[in-house]
Amino acid sequence: MFASNLDERISRTVWMESKVQAQDMFKYIVNNPGNQTLDGLKSVAINVIGQAGFSQKEDWTPGLRARLGAATTGKAAYFETLSLITQMFLEAALLPTKFMKLPIMSRGLQLLGYHMERTPEYVQEVLNEERNATEKAGGSRSNFLSLLLQLSDEDRRSGQSQFSLSDDEISGSLFIFTTAGYETTANTMGYSVSFLAAYPQWQEWIREELQGLSEDPATWKYEEVFPKCRRTLALMVRSWPPSNSCQCQPFNLYM
């Protein structure tokens, strides 16, 4: 379902936001050397997915928790909720919100409980905001939520309501897109950076490709530059992923 709805407009949004986030991270790391690369990549991942998912713009920060606690309504609060859930997934899945909000709990856990109780309100606000923004723009915007709303509303208008998604189904799809996309993207980038650190010869291989591009990343256009980044893409989308493989083999059962 996701792949069929991710058109070139969303890919372009991912490209543009990734450039901005990566440049901000690079500037910080150059001036503040230390073991913060993996945490920084997590911040890149969640920010890009927030922008591609529902047009939530966030500045890059060295750690995800550095900016939590300020949002109270709408997309900002929903984004903060998703950020907390991705960091404390087991707690979010297993602990009741009343337990999270106890005074003896950590500030992060109390904040998670506060937001999870209000998630239905946030979701409705996000959907209403996106519908209003789409209506003002005169068509769907370049994010995943806008496409889902457009497809669902078109089915309703054409009398095919049995094929349209309810608001709950749309919010569930957005949640999966955000959380699963964050985990996959952050782990893939983190593994790739660790791989490059362990094998410097592949750094040179990637650098040869990048030397053919403009020195100013701000000038990189998606349609022109992305097709040239074949080595970078090969490193990120490899045939041997960081997770363990599970092979299945058919066999006959004899009675």
Can you name each region flagged by the protein language model?
Residues 53-68:
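Short conserved catalytic/interaction loops centered on acidic-Pro-aromatic/His motifs
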Residues 48, 173, 188-192, 235:
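Short, hydrophobic/aromatic alpha-helical segments in well-folded domains
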Residues 57-58, 87-94, 126-141, 244-248:
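Proline-centered turn/helix-capping motifs that create local helix->coil transitions or kinks
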Residues 112-188, 251:
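Conserved cytochrome P450 catalytic core segment spanning the I/J/K helices
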Residues 51-56, 192-199:
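Active-site catalytic microenvironments for nucleophilic, acid-base chemistry
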Residues 1-53, 71-128, 215-216:
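Cytochrome P450 catalytic-domain helical core, especially the substrate-recognition surface
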